């Protein structure tokens, strides 16, 4: 089934993916294209509506991103946001200029709305502004429909041509009733019906996969992460026993993670699963290696070798399943080419695996949509909402050289940490939390005796996408319980510290 489509035209704004997600939350399928996309390509997509994103440039400068005037002649409703309203105004003959110190607006701003179908049902008057330029004169045929004390054109429209623009950001949470404005644009102006749901996606995708793969064979590298897990179950729904999954257990997983993967996919979904216990092999390769990038490279390359060896035992495979999701496609060139994700985001495409074609069942989905699909498919919440885990696993959470002893210590400490977060009801509130084992020992006193044991670092952050993050303000009583349990229950640890570094300047992982 072909769904109604709204296009987001990206001018370099930081919220391009957020806008697309907001559209999809309205049950409308959405894709992102760069502002350099040709008019022919836009026409081929046959969109019901178009949204211009914000951007860091000034519309009146010659080298700034622009758009062909032809797009305004398509008869398709267009909504310009921030830079989007400015480039619309500039291209159509309005005047955009740099704002003076008083005219620059950042953060929550009081606004006065006029009559417009965009603002139907809006009862609040606070929006989120982030601009240094402003529209001094709107193009011919446009009407000003909102203003602030310092921004005379906070919104404009040309109803006859179905062109609309807002200077603020309705897509961000801080903009009161911004979701209503987007809904009004989609349903009142673009006249969409809202036919994009997880149910419809699953049904359409299974049908598509059956037609594409038929009775041929597919191979999937299963990590136990959300993306590869959902991809595997979706493919299995379509082709059943013609799917084989290889799960390379490199010995660098969290406590019980390998057993959980085996239980879920073998017992619950009855998927052909080959579990390869390669712990000794990986630890042998990592012996004495302490530099983070060297560890990453070793783990990535060794995974590829193990995967190739196991897949070659199976003979020819027609399809290789990849868990590529939509942000990967966007970041690789706005849909021109897909980023081929390797297992755990390490390594690359196996060179010696005999397959004809790659299949990416999730390439149209954002992460939150992948999770919804996973729940619809019956994958348990514990896996679907598990915190992000790096490809090299404990190999980069053990700081310095990696040994089995250190991995075992870290596994136990991390398990205690996660257990306490779940008991406190904080696990789902946190984007990512984990324990790390620095290559440091400290002096302590336990049972009236001097100890010299490892220090464990705790990390917890909040984020929407992992690009930036804030350290999580953990309640002191929870921290105290976690620290006491780790020191009392995990042999080889006598000190616990909590990392309060945001990103930037730090990264989320320590290595």
From Swiss-Prot:
MF terms (GO), sorted A to Z: ATP binding; GMP synthase activity
UniProt entry tagged with the keyword Nucleotidyltransferase: no
Binding site residues for ATP: 223-229
Transmembrane segments: none
Pathway: Purine metabolism; GMP biosynthesis; GMP from XMP (L-Gln route): step 1/1
Ranges for domain Glutamine amidotransferase type-1: 5-195
Reactions it catalyzes: XMP + L-glutamine + ATP + H2O = GMP + L-glutamate + AMP + diphosphate + 2 H(+)
Annotated coiled-coil segments of the chain: none
NCBIfam families linked to this entry: guaA_Cterm, guaA_Nterm, PRK00074.1
Function: Catalyzes the synthesis of GMP from XMP.
Protein name from the UniProt record: GMP synthase [glutamine-hydrolyzing]
Organism in which the protein naturally occurs: Clostridioides difficile (strain 630)
């Amino acid at each position: 089934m072909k769904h109604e489509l709204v296009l987001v035209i990206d001018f370099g704004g930081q919220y391009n993916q957020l806008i697309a997600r907001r559209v999809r939350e309205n049950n409308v399928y959405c894709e992102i294209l760069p502002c350099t996309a040709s008019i022919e390509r836009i026409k081929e997509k046959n969109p019901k509506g178009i949204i211009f994103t914000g951007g860091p440039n000034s519309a009146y400068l010659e080298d700034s991103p622009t758009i062909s005037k032809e797009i305004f002649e398509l008869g398709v409703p267009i909504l310009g946001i921030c830079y989007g309203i400015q480039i619309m105004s500039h291209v159509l003959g309005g005047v955009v200029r740099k704002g003076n110190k008083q005219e620059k607006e950042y953060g929550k701003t009081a606004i006065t709305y006029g009559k417009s179908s965009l603002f139907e049902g809006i009862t609040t008057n606070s929006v989120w502004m982030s601009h240094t330029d402003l529209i001094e004169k709107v193009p011919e045929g446009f009407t000003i429909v909102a203003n602030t004390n310092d921004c005379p054109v906070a919104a404009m429209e040309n109803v006859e041509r179905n062109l609309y623009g807002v200077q603020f950001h309705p897509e961000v949470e801080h903009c009161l009733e911004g979701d209503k404005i987007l809904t009004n644009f989609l349903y009142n102006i673009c006249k969409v019906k809202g036919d994009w749901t997880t149910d419809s996606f699953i049904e359409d995708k299974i049908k598509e996969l059956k037609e594409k793969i038929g009775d041929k064979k597919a191979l999937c590298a299963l990590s136990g992460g959300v993306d590869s897990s959902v991809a595997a179950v979706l493919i299995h729904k379509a082709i059943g026993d013609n799917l084989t999954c290889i799960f390379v257990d490199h010995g660098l997983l969290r406590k019980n993670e390998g057993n959980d993967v085996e239980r879920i996919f073998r017992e619950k979904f009855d998927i052909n699963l080959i579990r390869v216990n390669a712990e000794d092999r990986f630890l042998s390769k990592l012996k004495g290696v302490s530099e983070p990038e060297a560890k990453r490279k070793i783990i990535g390359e060794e995974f590829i070798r193990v995967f190739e060896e196991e897949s070659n035992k199976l003979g020819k495979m027609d399809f290789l399943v990849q868990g590529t999701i939509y942000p990967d496609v966007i970041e690789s060139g706005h849909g021109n080419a897909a980023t081929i994700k390797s297992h755990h985001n390490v390594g690359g495409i196996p060179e010696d695996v005999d397959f004809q074609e790659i299949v990416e069942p999730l390439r149209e989905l954002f992460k939150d949509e992948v999770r919804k699909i996973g729940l619809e498919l019956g994958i348990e919440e514990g896996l679907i909402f598990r915190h992000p885990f790096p490809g090299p696993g404990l190999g980069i959470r053990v700081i310095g050289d990696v040994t089995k002893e250190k991995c075992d210590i870290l596994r136990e400490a991390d398990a205690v940490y996660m257990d306490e977060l779940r008991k406190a009801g904080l696990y789902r509130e946190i984007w990512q939390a984990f324990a790390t084992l620095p290559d440091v020992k400290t002096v302590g006193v336990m049972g009236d005796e001097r100890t010299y044991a490892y220090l464990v670092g705790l990390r917890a952050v909040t984020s929407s996408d992992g690009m930036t993050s804030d350290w999580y303000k953990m309640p002191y009583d929870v921290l105290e319980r976690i620290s006491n349990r780790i020191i009392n229950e995990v042999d080889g640890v006598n000190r616990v510290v909590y990392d309060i570094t945001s990103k930037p300047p730090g990264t989320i992982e320590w290595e």
